[in-house]
Amino acid sequence: MTVMKEKGRKVIATNRRARHNYTILDTYEAGIVLVGTEVKSLREGKASLVDAFATVDNGEVWLRGLHIPEFSHGTWTNHSPRRVRKLLLHKREIERLVGKSREGNQTLVPLSMYFSDGKVKVELALARGKQDYDKRQDLARRTAEREVTRELGRRVKGMR
C-alpha cells in the first residue's frame, strides 16, 4: 500500500470495509502510542486496519487487531505486528465515547491512519453495525445514483 496525500496529510491506511459494514455516527481524531520500528514501517506505507477495533479499559482506549508488519531493515528490536496499542484522547472524549457506546450496539472502529505534522493519527469512528438489508439498500441507492449521473452525462453530450 502506498502513502497518499489527502487534505494536507499523508494517509497510510484506510478501512474501506468499515463504511460498508457500519453506519458512522461520530468521528474522532486520536494519537497513537508506537515504538520506533512501527513508525518506520508506517513511513513505508505498510499497515492494515481490516480487523481493527478499539476498546475502552479503565479509562484508556486501546486499539486491537491493527496489523503493522515488522520493519524490513529491523533487527532483534523489531515489534510484534499485532500488539495492542494505546490511543491518546482527551478525558472528556473518552467519557463521551464510553457513554455513547453503552447506549447499545455501538462500537469503535478505526477509519484511517495518517501522518499529521510528523505524528501518526488515527481517525476513530463511533459506529453501529449494519444489517444485510441495510447494505442491500445502500447498494441499490448507489446504483440508482450512478445510473442517473450516467444518463445526465449522455444527455449533456447529446446537446452539444
Curated annotation (Swiss-Prot):
The keyword Zinc does not apply. PANTHER family: SSRA-BINDING PROTEIN (PTHR30308:SF2), TMRNA-BINDING COMPONENT OF TRANS-TRANSLATION TAGGING COMPLEX (PTHR30308). Keywords: Cytoplasm, RNA-binding. It comes from the Bacteria. NCBIfam families: PRK05422.1, smpB. InterPro entries: SmpB, SsrA-bd_prot, SsrA-bd_prot_CS. The gene is smpB. This is SsrA-binding protein. Required for rescue of stalled ribosomes mediated by trans-translation. Binds to transfer-messenger RNA (tmRNA), required for stable association of tmRNA with ribosomes. tmRNA and SmpB together mimic tRNA shape, replacing the anticodon stem-loop with SmpB. tmRNA is encoded by the ssrA gene; the 2 termini fold to resemble tRNA(Ala) and it encodes a 'tag peptide', a short internal open reading frame. During trans-translation Ala-aminoacylated tmRNA acts like a tRNA, entering the A-site of stalled ribosomes, displacing the stalled mRNA. One of its GO terms (molecular function) is RNA binding. GO terms for biological process: trans-translation. It is found in: Cytoplasm. Belongs to the SmpB family. One of its GO terms (cellular component) is cytosol.
